[in-house]
């Protein structure tokens, strides 16, 4: 018999740096999950991702207080800011441009994000990421 799902918890946690402090501790604690067990499992799973990169995770909590989790790829905005070397996007993206990204950088980000994107091929994924870049106030070269 399948376990009964009690809750889904969606968090963004720095890769390899999960610890019991907020936001992880309170979110898991209110559902009775063993926080240290999650932190150790999450850190082990994200050790191959660049440390400190925010990584979305969906935690499924079952009625017997056990859990499973699925890690997603880092948000496109974070990867774009890293590629462009900027701290934050533009407040008025259509008027003020804050940086530039090339098609090669977009392709690299699209390959990283491919498991989470609904794009049918790499070119469609690149166009999706380029749209995110433009809405952040980045110039897109070579597209």
UniProtKB/Swiss-Prot annotation:
This chain's protein is named Large ribosomal subunit protein uL11
Note the PANTHER family from the entry.
60S RIBOSOMAL PROTEIN L12, LARGE RIBOSOMAL SUBUNIT PROTEIN UL11M
Q: Per the record's keyword annotation, is rRNA-binding included, yes or no?
A: yes
**Family, as annotated:** Belongs to the universal ribosomal protein uL11 family.
Instruction: Write out the GO cellular component annotations.
Output: cytosolic large ribosomal subunit
Q: Which HAMAP family match?
A: Ribosomal_uL11
What are the record keywords, sorted? Methylation, Ribonucleoprotein, Ribosomal protein, RNA-binding, rRNA-binding
Q: What's this protein's function?
A: Forms part of the ribosomal stalk which helps the ribosome interact with GTP-bound translation factors.
Q: Which GO terms describe its biological process?
A: translation
Q: Identify the species of origin.
A: Chromohalobacter salexigens (strain ATCC BAA-138 / DSM 3043 / CIP 106854 / NCIMB 13768 / 1H11)
């Amino acid at each position: 018999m399948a376990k009964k799902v009690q809750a889904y918890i969606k968090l963004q946690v720095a890769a390899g740096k999960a610890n019991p402090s907020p936001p992880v501790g309170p979110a898991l604690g209110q559902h009775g999950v063993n926080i240290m067990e999650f932190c150790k499992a999450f850190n082990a799973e994200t050790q191959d991702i660049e440390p400190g990169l925010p990584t979305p995770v969906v935690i499924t909590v079952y009625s017997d207080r056990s859990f499973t989790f699925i890690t997603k790829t880092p948000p496109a905005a974070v990867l774009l800011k890293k590629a462009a070397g900027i701290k934050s996007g533009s407040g008025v993206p259509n008027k003020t441009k804050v940086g530039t990204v090339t098609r090669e950088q977009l392709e690299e980000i699209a390959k990283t994000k491919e498991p989470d994107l609904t794009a049918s091929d790499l070119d469609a994924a690149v166009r999706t990421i380029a749209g995110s870049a433009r809405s952040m106030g980045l110039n897109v070269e070579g597209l």
